[in-house]
Swiss-Prot record:
Protein name: Ribosome-recycling factor
HAMAP family per record: RRF (MF_00040)
Pfam assignment, any one: RRF
GO MF annotations in UniProt: ribosomal large subunit binding
Amino acid sequence: MLTQEVELNMQKSVEACQRNFNTIRTGRANTSLLDRLTVEYYGADTPLKSLATISTPDSQTLAIQPFDLGSLGLIEKAISISDLGFTPNNDGKIIRINIPPLTEERRKQFCKLASKYAEEAKISLRNIRRDAIEKIKGSEKDGEFSEDQSRDQQDSIQKITNKYINEIEKNLSGKEEEILKV
């Protein structure tokens, strides 16, 4: 049962890492670039995807069509002041964002950011492993497990950890390749 719980928690960490990877620019338009953008709408920070439809008409353009045209200016302002580095073009109905090609320096910065996200996910996996092993050792002290059962459980947890760390490494190398591809 503990191994299933560990596996589930580790899978969630890998998924969180992948969501972080999706927010990194690769030089191509991708709607997930705006996932973390919030707009101050009626005094509350509201996620952009709750206020508008975001689409990619071509590989270098994002189109944002608000449900309420009154929020157009607020969305444009939120994009302008964000740290995304985009310049929104407002035509009165739709906001278009042209995704500029990435410079070599910017690509390297994004690779470092991807590495940081991967390292955070691996730390999360190691913390999950540590907590599980502490539970196993506690159960061994309480007499619920024999020493051999405890060792088998710990080996099982380590194998699961290695599997998910390898998955994160594979995702990272794929993301770095995507970022560096010109």
